[in-house]
């Protein structure tokens, strides 16, 4: 049974990483340091500019986050790839929220643009995911556009984020 709500706490997201939110067959989120969000504040099945679904999530920035110590020494910045991964994580989470089963895998992105950075002085990152299409056949796949904001300023844009759910990843 899918635990389908419009918002999720950090504890809920951690439970997803253990396979407790969408069941053992649903797609888990990453756990530990690779979970790149602290809460989902809005999820809709029919929202967004394409009326195919929308997610808004947040990540609290603290100066002691693990990546600031190593990326880069004396020039700390959150790696842009972690923001991109967060958007893929949210696309996979949405597929599980819809009842999809399997392990989530990022399948690509059409275009990514970085116009800013996330520094240790920032307070909050906001992710917005706007779904364009969900394919539910042998392969379950979500296609979405995403935006990343730091303290309200748009800094990353991604077009055609693709995530698929796979019951068997041995040949992937």
Curated annotation (Swiss-Prot):
Report the main location listed first in the record.
cytoplasm
Alphabetically list the UniProt keywords: Cytoplasm, Fatty acid biosynthesis, Fatty acid metabolism, Isomerase, Lipid biosynthesis, Lipid metabolism, Lyase
Catalytic residue positions: 71
Subunit (UniProt): Homodimer.
Question: What GO terms are given for molecular function?
Answer: (3R)-hydroxyacyl-[acyl-carrier-protein] dehydratase activity; trans-2-decenoyl-acyl-carrier-protein isomerase activity
For this protein, the record's NCBIfam families field holds: fabA (TIGR01749), PRK05174.1 (NF003509)
Task: Give the E.C. number(s).
Answer: 4.2.1.59, 5.3.3.14
**Gene3D superfamilies with a match to the protein in the record:** Hotdog Thioesterase (3.10.129.10)
What family name appears in the similarity comment? Answer: Belongs to the thioester dehydratase family. FabA subfamily.
What name does the UniProt record give this protein? 3-hydroxydecanoyl-[acyl-carrier-protein] dehydratase
Look up the record and name the pathway of this protein. Lipid metabolism; fatty acid biosynthesis
Please tell me the species this chain comes from: Proteus mirabilis (strain HI4320)
Q: Which residues form a coiled coil?
A: none
Q: Which gene encodes it?
A: fabA
Biological role: Necessary for the introduction of cis unsaturation into fatty acids. Catalyzes the dehydration of (3R)-3-hydroxydecanoyl-ACP to E-(2)-decenoyl-ACP and then its isomerization to Z-(3)-decenoyl-ACP. Can catalyze the dehydratase reaction for beta-hydroxyacyl-ACPs with saturated chain lengths up to 16:0, being most active on intermediate chain length.
> Which Pfam families does the UniProt entry name for this protein?
FabA
Q: What is an annotated GO biological process for this record, any one?
A: unsaturated fatty acid biosynthetic process
Q: Which GO terms describe its cellular component?
A: cytoplasm
Reactions catalysed? a (3R)-hydroxyacyl-[ACP] = a (2E)-enoyl-[ACP] + H2O; (3R)-hydroxydecanoyl-[ACP] = (2E)-decenoyl-[ACP] + H2O; (2E)-decenoyl-[ACP] = (3Z)-decenoyl-[ACP]
């Amino acid at each position: 049974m899918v635990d389908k709500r419009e918002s999720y706490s950090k504890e809920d997201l951690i439970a997803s990483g253990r396979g407790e939110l969408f069941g053992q067959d649903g797609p888990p989120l990453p756990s530990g340091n690779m979970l790149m969000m602290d809460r989902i504040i809005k999820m809709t099945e029919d929202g967004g500019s394409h009326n195919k679904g929308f997610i808004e999530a947040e990540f609290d920035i603290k100066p002691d986050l693990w990546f600031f110590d190593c990326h880069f020494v004396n020039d700390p910045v959150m790696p842009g790839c972690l923001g991109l991964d967060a958007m893929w994580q949210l696309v996979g989470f949405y597929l599980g929220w819809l009842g999809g089963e399997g392990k989530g895998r990022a399948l690509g992105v059409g275009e990514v643009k970085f116009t800013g950075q996330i520094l240790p002085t920032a307070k909050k990152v906001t992710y917005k995911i706007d779904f364009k299409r969900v394919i539910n056949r042998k392969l379950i796949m979500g296609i979405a556009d995403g935006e990343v904001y730091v303290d309200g300023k748009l800094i990353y844009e991604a077009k055609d984020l693709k995530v698929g759910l796979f019951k068997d990843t041995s040949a992937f």
